[in-house]
């Protein structure tokens, strides 16, 4: 059974939750052993996969969990706005560290390495390639280039203003076009995640609402301050 077939089976059985275990940079939680513990807890709670950033975090997590890991490396580049797995060396390092799926930025922006080359490198390692996209055009272009999975990860993050709500219409449009879609980005409640499935998502990635304690506390603090004013 292929990994996609196994994921199809697991998603059908448990609902398709993927947990992104990426603490706020510099947080007390931003340590490989804590990231790995989060991932293990997510697996034990029914997550079908986890999304992990960074080689040290990935290695530690791989030693603890059995679910597939979506691996990424984030970089801040002077010459490009692309942050997610921009280099071929990043793909190689993620493959060696134990990722089963490698995600790359799939947007049509200036970049050091073409999306096509990154996807080909992932497949060279016999791994699944995921493209983090911002639009229907991005998603369809990456699908044509061979991406196995299209994520809505970048929707709302390539423009000056980021909406509060997730991009459900993008999920539907990509699904209707025949893409295997992971809904990602601002799915901050179970209701929104469930709505993504109704719109055609294959699975839903949730990050901040589960693993970023500072964000969750901020939401509660803001609500309490408004109630008290």
Curated annotation (Swiss-Prot):
It is an enzyme of class 5 (isomerase). Pathway: Amino-sugar metabolism; N-acetylneuraminate degradation; D-fructose 6-phosphate from N-acetylneuraminate: step 3/5. GO terms for cellular component: cytosol. Keywords: Carbohydrate metabolism, Isomerase. InterPro entries: Aldolase_TIM, NanE, RibuloseP-bd_barrel. It catalyses: an N-acyl-D-glucosamine 6-phosphate = an N-acyl-D-mannosamine 6-phosphate. The keyword rRNA processing does not apply. It comes from the Bacteria. GO terms for biological process: carbohydrate metabolic process; N-acetylmannosamine catabolic process; N-acetylneuraminate catabolic process. Its EC number is 5.1.3.9. CDD domains: NanE. GO terms for molecular function: N-acylglucosamine-6-phosphate 2-epimerase activity. Belongs to the NanE family. Converts N-acetylmannosamine-6-phosphate (ManNAc-6-P) to N-acetylglucosamine-6-phosphate (GlcNAc-6-P). This is Putative N-acetylmannosamine-6-phosphate 2-epimerase 2.
């Amino acid at each position: 059974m292929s990994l996609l077939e196994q994921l199809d089976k697991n998603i059908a059985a448990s609902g398709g939750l993927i947990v992104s275990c990426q603490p706020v940079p510099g947080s007390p939680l931003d340590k490989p052993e804590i990231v790995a513990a989060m991932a293990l807890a997510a697996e034990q709670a029914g997550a079908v996969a986890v999304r992990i950033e960074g080689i040290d975090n990935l290695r530690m997590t791989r030693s603890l969990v059995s679910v597939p890991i979506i691996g990424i490396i984030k970089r801040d580049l002077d010459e490009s706005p692309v942050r997610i797995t921009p280099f071929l060396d990043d793909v190689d390092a993620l493959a060696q560290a134990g990722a089963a799926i490698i995600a790359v930025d799939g947007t049509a922006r200036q970049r050091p390495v073409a999306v096509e080359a990154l996807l080909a490198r992932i497949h060279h390692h016999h791994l699944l390639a995921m493209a983090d996209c911002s639009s229907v055009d991005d998603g369809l272009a990456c699908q044509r280039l061979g991406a196995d999975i299209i994520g809505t990860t970048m929707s709302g993050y390539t423009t000056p203003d980021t909406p509060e709500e997730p991009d459900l219409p993008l999920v539907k449009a990509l699904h209707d076009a025949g893409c295997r879609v992971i809904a990602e980005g601002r799915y901050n409640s179970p209701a929104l995640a469930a709505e993504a499935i109704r719109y055609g998502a294959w699975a839903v990635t949730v990050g901040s609402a589960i693993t970023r304690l500072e964000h969750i506390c901020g939401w509660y603090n803001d609500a309490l301050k408004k109630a008290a004013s």
